[in-house]
Amino acid sequence: MFMGKMGLLGIALFCFAAMVCSVHGYDAGWVNAHATFYGGSDASGTMGGACGYGNLYSQGYGTNTAALSTALFNNGLSCGACFEIKCQSDGAWCLPGAIIVTATNFCPPNNALPNNAGGWCNPPLHHFDLSQPVFQRIAQYKAGVVPVSYRRVPCMRRGGIRFTINGHSYFNLVLVTNVGGAGDVHSVAVKGSRTRWQQMSRNWGQNWQSNNLLNGQALSFKVTASDGRTVVSNNIAPASWSFGQTFTGRQFR
């Protein structure tokens, strides 16, 4: 009887995990889209961007990055999400294999151009504007734009989630990077050593804001991703922290 109950519990947990993955895009099958590229052969033009990550090399994202069209960007909530992409249905320009990229920027619409002739990022199109180096791993440079298939995949990161504290007193702006698992953060809370947990508001990209006075307190952070999973990093910033510093917390597993 005990083994039977444990077996049923295991099946239930497996089904729940499968349901969560399906709801948030994992194992949901391949979706058709298009891809172009930008940023130059060294991807220098991809630095910065609407997600606020700044230097993508120093942040660990490198050149495996993409700017997302309006339909995918979700007003910045998709920043940090990972996608597997492969070129399809174009034997003249496609290369074999697939790439995995992180969403780091926004590809704005160009309503002056038709959706199929320059307005690739116009709603409701699903479009990836890739860094040039990663584009050339699935298609030839001369192609310019190619049909692709994509799917959401978990993000694999080295080390823990990183929290960079910017701003000033009463305006704490925390950039959250290097997030594994779902990758796209939908909620952040902060707790000082003399305060309770306080929900932060998303300022832009993956910059999260708190208007409370947190100076002189050890800081803990609670991060919730789009799949509903939460990870808590306790007291990762000492009471002596200062603006401009980066601290590493726990990671999604």
Swiss-Prot record:
It is found in: Secreted, Cell wall; Membrane. Causes loosening and extension of plant cell walls by disrupting non-covalent bonding between cellulose microfibrils and matrix glucans. No enzymatic activity has been found. This is Expansin-A15. PROSITE patterns: EXPANSIN_CBD (PS50843), EXPANSIN_EG45 (PS50842). GO terms for cellular component: extracellular region; membrane. Keywords: Cell wall, Cell wall biogenesis/degradation, Membrane, Secreted, Signal. It is a peripheral membrane protein. SMART domains: DPBB_1 (SM00837). It comes from the Eukaryota. Belongs to the expansin family. Expansin A subfamily. Residues 48-160 form the Expansin-like EG45 domain. Residues 1-25 form the signal peptide. Residues 170-249 form the Expansin-like CBD domain. It comes from Arabidopsis thaliana. GO terms for biological process: plant-type cell wall loosening; syncytium formation. Pfam families: DPBB_1 (PF03330), Expansin_C (PF01357). The keyword Nuclease does not apply. The keyword Signal applies.
